[in-house]
Amino acid sequence: MAKKVTGMIKLQLQAGKATPAPPVGPALGQHGVNIMGFCKEFNAKTANQAGYIIPVVITVYQDRSFSFILKTPPAAVLIKKEIGLESGSGVPNKTKVGKLTQDQLKKIAETKMPDLNAASLESAMRMIAGTARSMGVTIEE
């Protein structure tokens, strides 16, 4: 018989830098999960993605065990990394902060593809382009 699920926790953590401090500790503590066990496992699995923010979905079972699924980094984080930005524009319709080429856009879309509900690479590229525009990044044709 399958284990009974008692909770789902969604967090966005720095790759390889999960610690028992907030937000990890309180989120897992209220479900009775071994916090250090999660931190060690998460850090081991994300060590090669240093510098990225990794969304993680933690499933907590009745016997206080857990499993987790790593997602791809948010599109905004990938865009900022690709063009070397610190942050997006405060007023994206007026202030432009960078340019993204079609090749860079395609690379980001391919990275995000498993987590997007897009049927094709072209539609994934349009989704990423929309995110870029809302950050004040222009897309070169």
From Swiss-Prot:
Keyword terms, alphabetized: Methylation, Ribonucleoprotein, Ribosomal protein, RNA-binding, rRNA-binding
Post-translational modification: One or more lysine residues are methylated.
Single biological process term from Gene Ontology: translation
CDD domains according to UniProt: Ribosomal_L11
Highest taxon, organism lineage: Bacteria
Coiled coil: none
SMART domains assigned to the protein according to its UniProt record, in alphabetical order: RL11
Record GO terms (molecular function): large ribosomal subunit rRNA binding; structural constituent of ribosome
Gene Ontology cellular component terms for the protein in this record: cytosolic large ribosomal subunit
InterPro entries, sorted: Ribosomal_uL11, Ribosomal_uL11_bac-typ, Ribosomal_uL11_C, Ribosomal_uL11_C_sf, Ribosomal_uL11_N, Ribosomal_uL11_N_sf
Protein name: Large ribosomal subunit protein uL11
Family: Belongs to the universal ribosomal protein uL11 family.
Keyword Hydrolase: no
Record organism: Clostridium beijerinckii (strain ATCC 51743 / NCIMB 8052)
Cited function: Forms part of the ribosomal stalk which helps the ribosome interact with GTP-bound translation factors.
Quaternary data: Part of the ribosomal stalk of the 50S ribosomal subunit. Interacts with L10 and the large rRNA to form the base of the stalk. L10 forms an elongated spine to which L12 dimers bind in a sequential fashion forming a multimeric L10(L12)X complex.
Disulphide bridges: none
